[in-house]
Amino acid sequence: MVPKVVDLQRIANDKTRITTYKKRKASLYKKAQEFSTLCGVETCLIVYGPTKATDVVISEPEIWPKDETKVRAIIRKYKDTVSTSCRKETNVETFVNDVGKGNEVVTKKRVKRENKYSSWEEKLDKCSREQLHGIFCAVDSKLNEAVTRQERSMFRVNHQAMDTPFPQNLMDQQFMPQYFHEQPQFQGFPNNFNNMGFSLISPHDGQIQMDPNLMEKWTDLALTQSLMMSKGNDGTQFMQRQEQPYYNREQVVSRSAGFNVNPFMGYQVPFNIPNWRLSGNQVENWELSGKKTI
């Protein structure tokens, strides 16, 4: 059997309302006792009974359990718990101080933000048109100076990156031959160096036995002329002068073929002089003399 649904609203009939109160009060006390016993918790009830429609005086409250001491102990315990849980206390003075500090922090943040991202200076409102034009020209000039300074700095950095530092140990004679030996692409001094019409080193290094004395002679010559090595953009080694270019101020005169045969008479270097190195008259004199190449 389905239980009847109770209409939850105040009972208008006084007699029926008082009867319902007595029944439900007994049921409520029974449930409170079961709850306290089964769960092991302290429980108390304070109930104010109903009054008639014409009765203004409120009836005496009813308590459960009937022992008033137990009820007061539970109420006192509740009050103590509530008072200790509210640890944060304040008064009017503290509240006003907290509000003032909060407003001060907000004001500082606003001023800092305005100073950092300022879009207009109030002093400019009092300037004339000529003064504003002068300020505009000054700002434009400062901007151009900054751009020019930045371009110069970039050019200086790029120029320094293109320059190859000069190896200082090349100026020492004991490191100069080793440096030349480690450069396979270096074949010798350039042609016509110091008015000599032939290369000092043959491009075929494997066919000629190098003389250590001759290598030392070339090292001394390079140090005398203040030569240095630099590397090009493609990795090629070039011979360049350290300071002023060297010019041979001797008068250029026609030299005999015998002069160009072997400028280093004390060294055994087997090499021949090709005909294209000599002028026409020198070739004829060489062939008519009947001399043989070394």
UniProtKB/Swiss-Prot annotation:
GO terms for cellular component: nucleus. The keyword Transcription regulation applies. Its main location: nucleus. GO terms for biological process: positive regulation of transcription by RNA polymerase II. InterPro entries: MADS-box/MEF2_TF, SRF-like_MADS-box, TF_MADSbox, TF_MADSbox_sf. Pfam families: SRF-TF. PROSITE patterns: MADS_BOX_2. Residues 1-51 form the MADS-box domain. The keyword Iron-sulfur does not apply. It comes from the Eukaryota. GO terms for molecular function: cis-regulatory region sequence-specific DNA binding; DNA-binding transcription factor activity; DNA-binding transcription factor activity, RNA polymerase II-specific; protein dimerization activity. Keywords: DNA-binding, Nucleus, Transcription, Transcription regulation. It is found in: Nucleus. Interacts with MEE14/CBP1. Probable transcription factor that may function in the maintenance of the proper function of the central cell in pollen tube attraction. This is Agamous-like MADS-box protein AGL82. The lineage of its organism: Eukaryota, Viridiplantae, Streptophyta, Embryophyta, Tracheophyta.
